[in-house]
Every structure is written in structure tokens, then in C-alpha cells.
Curated annotation (Swiss-Prot):
Gene responsible for this protein: rrp4
Biological processes per GO annotation: CUT catabolic process; exonucleolytic trimming to generate mature 3'-end of 5.8S rRNA from tricistronic rRNA transcript (SSU-rRNA, 5.8S rRNA, LSU-rRNA); poly(A)-dependent snoRNA 3'-end processing; RNA catabolic process; U4 snRNA 3'-end processing
Organism annotation: Methanosphaera stadtmanae (strain ATCC 43021 / DSM 3091 / JCM 11832 / MCB-3)
Main subcellular location of this protein, as a coarse class: cytoplasm
Annotated protein name in UniProt: Exosome complex component Rrp4
Pfam families associated with the record: ECR1_N_2, RRP4_S1
InterPro entries on file: Exosome_RNA_bind1/RRP40/RRP4, KH_dom_type_1_sf, NA-bd_OB-fold, Rrp4, RRP4_N, RRP4_S1, S1_domain
Localization: Cytoplasm
Length: 222
């Protein structure tokens, strides 16, 4: 049995279902029943159930694509701010170019990087990696910070909108799971995308006409 509606707001400990769903983020299983571990919106997706946090806090998971800022360095790693209460670090063993003789020629303090979460340990340290295709340093573009429900709205629930935005504005957009979005293109097109994202931030994502409004903004610019 399912005890909540899709996109219903739930509290920590709320009983979600006793059906055999796969556990997603923000959930846990006890005595054959699935509960919410956080305050957020419930999403039923295929065979999985998850809860997206309402508060603006990012909780890392293995494989997440994130945008981070280099805040410090040591002999063996860099400290990375991933817009979370969790501490991110990038070991030198996780570089995309292990043959570079001077690591400071690769990464510097304040650089913005596109990374993936390689591991989250028992004391909430987040090991990051650049050893996947497409990862690395941002040398241009604009990065903005948004709320977690907005990330879910654009990257999972309505991913087609992000594709549509890129195609019609001739821009590149990368959505980090940690609440940061990178946009690259002409200034006026970047401003259009920011306007669309601000609308999503202000409006209730559950509103039925929001998607149509966004599509209209994309197809019929002022």
C-alpha cells in the first residue's frame, strides 16, 4: 500500500509505503516499510521512491555530478567547496592528467570544477574525482546557485526542458546535483536562461501551467 501522494510534502519518519520499491535518496527501510528520512517532496519514479529536500541543503551520493570551488590544497589533495555541509576533497590520484609535473599548473585556488562524487565515508567526507569524460575546469561561462527542488525539476523530472533551453538559446547548460548550474553562451541568452530559472525558483513547481509558461518563454523571447 502507498500511504502518500506523489509530490506530497512529508516529514522525517513519515510512512511512505510498504510496497517493494527501490530506496532512493531521503528514504530508509524498516521492518519491510519505507519511511522518509528528511522533510521534503515525495517522488515515485518507476520502481523507485525518493524524497527531495525542501531545505537548501545538498546531501552527496555516489556518482552525483557536482560543481565545486577549490578552497585549499595540500601535498596529496585539494579541498573543494561543494555547496554542502559535507567536506569535499579531490585527491591527486583522481586527476584527469596524472603526468602533469606541477599540480598547480592544473588546479588553482578559486578554480571552478565539474566533478563526480566517488565516495562518501562514515564521517561525511566526500571524495571527488575528475577521472571521467567531460569533467574538468571551467574556463568560461556563468555559474548560479539555485534551490534543490529546482535542480530536481530541471535535471530529473523535466530534463527535456533543459535540452530545449540549450537548443533554442544556443547555450551549454550543466546542472550540478549540489545546487549549482553552469551556463555558457551569448550574454543575452544567458540572461534569458537566468530569467527562466528565477521563474522556477519563485513559482510552485507543482503548478500545472509552469511548464507551458517556460516553453512559451523559450520559444517566444521578448
Amino acid at each position: 500500500m502507498i500511504f502518500v501522494e506523489n509530490k506530497e510534502i512529508v516529514l522525517p519518519g513519515s510512512l511512505l509505503t510498504d510496497n517493494n520499491y527501490k530506496l532512493g535518496r531521503g528514504t530508509y527501510k524498516e521492518n519491510g516499510k519505507i519511511y522518509s528520512s528528511i522533510t521534503g517532496l515525495v517522488y515515485f519514479e518507476s520502481e523507485q521512491i525518493k524524497v527531495i529536500p525542501l531545505k537548501d541543503t545538498y546531501s552527496p551520493n555516489y556518482g552525483d555530478l557536482v560543481i565545486g570551488r577549490v578552497t585549499g590544497s595540500s601535498y596529496s589533495s585539494w579541498s573543494i567547496d561543494i555547496n554542502s555541509t559535507y567536506h569535499g576533497f579531490l585527491p591527486t590520484t583522481e586527476l584527469y592528467d596524472k603526468n602533469e609535473p606541477n599540480i598547480n599548473n592544473i588546479i588553482n585556488i578559486k578554480d571552478m570544477l565539474l566533478l563526480r562524487v566517488a565516495n562518501v565515508d562514515e564521517i561525511n567526507r566526500v571524495k571527488l574525482t575528475l577521472r571521467s569524460r567531460g569533467l574538468g575546469k571551467f574556463n568560461q561561462g556563468t555559474i548560479i546557485k539555485v534551490k534543490q527542488p529546482t535542480i530536481h525539476f530541471l535535471s530529473e523530472e523535466n530534463a527535456f526542458l533543459t535540452t530545449m533551453i540549450q537548443e533554442y538559446t544556443y547555450t551549454d547548460v550543466i546542472i550540478g546535483k549540489n545546487g549549482l548550474i553552469w551556463i555558457n553562451g551569448l550574454k543575452e541568452n544567458i540572461e534569458r536562461i537566468i530569467e527562466i530559472i528565477e521563474l522556477i525558483e519563485k513559482e510552485e513547481p507543482l503548478k500545472h501551467n509552469l511548464i507551458k509558461h517556460i516553453q512559451s518563454m523559450i520559444l517566444n523571447p521578448k
